[in-house]
From Swiss-Prot:
Domain ABC transporter: 1-236
GO MF term list: ATP binding; ATP hydrolysis activity
SUPFAM superfamilies for this protein: P-loop containing nucleoside triphosphate hydrolases (SSF52540)
Superkingdom per UniProt: Archaea
Pfam families, per the entry: ABC_tran
Similarity remark: Belongs to the ABC transporter superfamily.
InterPro entries named in the record: AAA+_ATPase, ABC_transporter-like_ATP-bd, P-loop_NTPase
Taxonomic lineage: Archaea, Methanobacteriati, Methanobacteriota, Methanomada group, Methanococci
Residues annotated to bind ATP: 36-43
Keyword terms of this UniProt record: ATP-binding, Nucleotide-binding, Transport
Protein name according to UniProt: Uncharacterized ABC transporter ATP-binding protein MJ0121
Organism field: Methanocaldococcus jannaschii (strain ATCC 43067 / DSM 2661 / JAL-1 / JCM 10045 / NBRC 100440) (Methanococcus jannaschii)
């Protein structure tokens, strides 16, 4: 079943009141943010989507696929759900090389494209300041390297059309580029975030409050331009962190580079 869009049918907030947002449809290639204070229900919304809820969760929301109730086997079998999740706390535990992991995952997904390993690693290295090599063992990858590899792997190999991202702002990767990469591969992307770089580069953001979808804000071109400028600062800070990590000194020249930019 090709998933072209999902629709969230509103349920109830923590007080049992109907959610102000009664329906929202998200199509492939769209990036939608989920914002709100701690305890506002962001993770529950993502969980409802991951479960393809049908009024059977605490929120009573329903999730439609292509405008229809998803088949029961899609709900019961995680493999048929085809939903990928990424979080800042995910790490690899398998004792194998990066190349072995990519080839194994590609084989399991029926992807036999030539140079698939190089393609995934090249994309991953666009997102991290620490280059990844195919002979690196997964267990020695840093947090930023792990998340970069996961994003590239989901984009290139995974056939999951829906990607749910839970607060990757502290994951040590180029966040702006990561979201653009996933959307460019035609994924439906929902991202929980407090980060202005991520929130402002989404097409829309769902504002959560008291367990309910309070409103939807369409991102303006002005906000997207602000996001690009903040992202430049963010990438500059990432480069400074990498210099510190590798034992290099910082100079006034490092500051002047940002000022000139």
């Amino acid at each position: 079943m090709e998933i072209k869009e999902i629709t969230i049918i509103g349920g109830y907030d923590k007080n049992g009141n109907p959610e102000p947002v009664r329906e929202v449809t998200i199509k492939r290639g769209e990036i939608v943010g989920v914002v709100g204070p701690t305890g506002s229900g962001k993770s529950n919304l993502i969980s409802d989507i991951e479960q393809l809820a049908q009024g059977d969760t605490i929120s009573k929301r329903r999730i439609l696929v292509n405008g229809e109730v998803p088949p029961i086997e899609m709900r019961r079998d995680p493999k048929k759900r085809r939903i990928a999740q990424l979080s800042q706390n995910m790490n690899f535990l398998a004792d194998m090389t990066v190349e072995e992991f990519i080839l194994m995952h590609a084989k399991s997904r029926g992807v036999y494209r030539e140079n698939i390993v190089d393609e995934v690693i090249e994309l991953a290295n666009r997102l991290t300041g620490e280059p990844i090599k195919k002979d690196y063992n997964l267990t020695i990858l840093s947090g930023g390297q792990s998340r970069s590899l996961m994003v590239a792997d989901v984009a290139v190999i995974s056939d999951s059309p829906i990607v749910l991202i839970d607060e990757i702002e502290n994951a040590g990767i180029k966040k702006h580029e990561a979201l653009e990469l996933l959307a460019g591969y035609g994924k439906i992307v929902l991202v929980i975030t407090h980060d202005p770089v991520l929130a402002l580069m989404t097409d829309r953001r769902i504002v959560m409050r008291n367990g309910g979808m309070q409103k939807i804000i369409e991102t303006t071109e002005e906000e997207k331009e602000i996001s690009r400028k903040i992202n430049e600062v963010d990438n500059w800070l990432l480069s400074l962190r990498e210099k510190i990590r590798f034992g290099e000194r910082l100079t006034h020249e490092d500051i002047s580079l940002m000022v000139k930019g």
